[in-house]
């Protein structure tokens, strides 16, 4: 089996901002021969599910999307992307599997860009997490961070497929049962100038509360920003990728970013125990 060339995204609010429009324009540029399917409040039956109904009432669109991305991949197959992913390549070389996703630097599944055949068992297990679960209760308990979808998907992968870690890729994706491939963060999250990046996650999500916890995607993009700006385009053509990375690693910028990465990881990386408790409790 292979993943169909259908790209799904959900837009529940009204007007799209300029950055979102730029991202969608990059999809049209690179995804020639793909169907790009925009879903909205009329085409996605959000009122049929407790989680999405209550999240919509609270106008927490990202948490509506958490359910949607699993629902649409399980029922239709294809590729799901957040609307704040800026594409640089197509997915042609990634479709010969049953499921793919990348990672975030916090060693969690990056749910902002993933593909699947319809009916995949891993997607179904993740979707089942939300069955009869109240978003309002989660929000009232101020527990939105604990219910971020990367945590849930990472935990279910670790339990159902006995995956101990999603790191140490050695330039190859992790190959897991049921045709699952997990890629490192340089494919779908950040661009580290290694010519492998498919898309950059800009991290424009509205669900984060910067006063209560750090934004790991922002930290990734901080690193990406300095890489691209620290090496002017003219200089990039003069040095090898290996040399550029070596220069970056000895620069003060690297040490600053490393510090903020550490602070973000402490606040955001889940433990097996706390996510297990979330799955057990309704």
Task: List each language-model region with its residue ranges.
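Small-residue hinge/turn detector
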Residues: 67-78
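Glycosyltransferase-associated regions of secretory-pathway enzymes
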Residues: 1-65, 83-282
């Amino acid at each position: 089996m292979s993943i169909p060339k259908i790209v799904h995204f959900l837009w529940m609010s009204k007007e799209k901002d300029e950055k979102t429009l730029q991202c969608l324009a990059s999809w049209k540029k690179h995804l020639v021969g793909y169907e790009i399917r925009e879903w909205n409040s009329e085409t996605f039956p959000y009122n049929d599910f407790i989680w999405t109904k209550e999240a919509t009432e609270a106008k927490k669109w990202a948490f509506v999307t958490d359910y949607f991305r699993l629902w649409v991949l399980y029922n239709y197959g294809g590729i799901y992307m957040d609307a704040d992913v800026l594409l640089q390549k197509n997915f042609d070389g990634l479709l010969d599997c049953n499921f793919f996703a990348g990672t975030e630097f916090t060693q969690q599944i990056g749910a902002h860009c993933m593909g699947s055949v319809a009916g995949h068992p891993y997607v179904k297990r993740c979707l089942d997490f939300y069955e009869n679960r109240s978003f309002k209760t989660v929000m009232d308990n101020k527990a939105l961070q604990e219910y971020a979808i990367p945590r849930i998907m990472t935990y279910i992968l670790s339990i159902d497929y006995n995956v101990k870690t999603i790191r140490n890729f050695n330039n190859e994706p992790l190959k897991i049962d049921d045709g699952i491939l997990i890629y490192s963060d340089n494919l779908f999250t950040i661009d580290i100038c290694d010519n492998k990046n498919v898309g950059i996650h800009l991290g424009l999500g509205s669900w984060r509360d910067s006063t209560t916890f750090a934004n790991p995607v922002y930290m990734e993009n901080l690193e990406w920003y300095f890489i691209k700006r620290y090496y002017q385009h003219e200089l990039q053509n003069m040095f090898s990728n290996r040399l550029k990375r070596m220069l970056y690693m000895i620069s003060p910028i690297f040490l600053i970013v490393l510090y903020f990465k550490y602070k973000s990881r402490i606040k955001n990386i889940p433990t097996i125990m706390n996510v297990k408790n979330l799955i057990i409790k309704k």
